[in-house]
Amino acid sequence: MVKAVVFDMDDTIFYPQLPFERALKAICPLYAGDVAETYHLFRRVSDKEFECVLRGECDTLTFQKIRFKKTMEQCAYEAVTDEQAADFQRCYLKEQEKIEMLAGIKETFDYLMAHNIKIGLLTNGPTQHQWKKIEYLKLREYIEEDHILVSQETGFAKPDKEIFDLMAARLGLTADDLLYVGDNCQTDILGGLQSGWRTIWINHKQEDVSAFGEFSTAFVIASHEELLATIEQLIP
């Protein structure tokens, strides 16, 4: 029986692409590449480079500059300076103050609360940065502070089993009681499944599900609008 539902944040509760797009246009107005593809590359680079922060090899500000510079380098854009990378980060943060929950998320939270199901948040990223997003999204109205876990606080990151185990301990539950909702098949879904959790994969990027045989036990939906109906099947 599901006793708690834990959510990823970026691209699951809200779309960070719009703040990214606005900041990119402000700092690199001549950039002509596909913004969606650039954003997804930015996320992949960010996930990889953040490992340096977890290992204590660089600080958050350095990481934020490096991820943007490497993203634009891989897009064959002109060399980005440290100053431009810092300007992008400032603009990106400012735009993030406007973020809102996606359609279907609030309704899902309301449903879970009405059925006395615990709600948790498990997110990768720098502690201060992720907590600002939590504040902008007003997630504390739905999620207790003790049920929120940001990877930098722990020294682990999804898909590490250790961070899922820490989340389970925070909730006072076992893996059999837990359901994880996320958009990233590697960090969210594989991490959850390998930790013994049930999972819902919001595959809004329309990735080829057949390419991921190990995810056959995950619930897969194509959009956030399908989330509540799927939750209702699991928690009637």
Predicted regions and their residues:
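Asp-based, Mg2+/Mn2+-dependent phosphohydrolase catalytic module
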Residues: M1-V5, G33, K106, D110, ...
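N-terminal helical cap/lid subdomain that shapes the substrate entry/recognition surface
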Residues: V2-A103, A114
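A structural motif corresponding to the C-terminal end of an alpha-helix
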Residues: T108, H115-N116
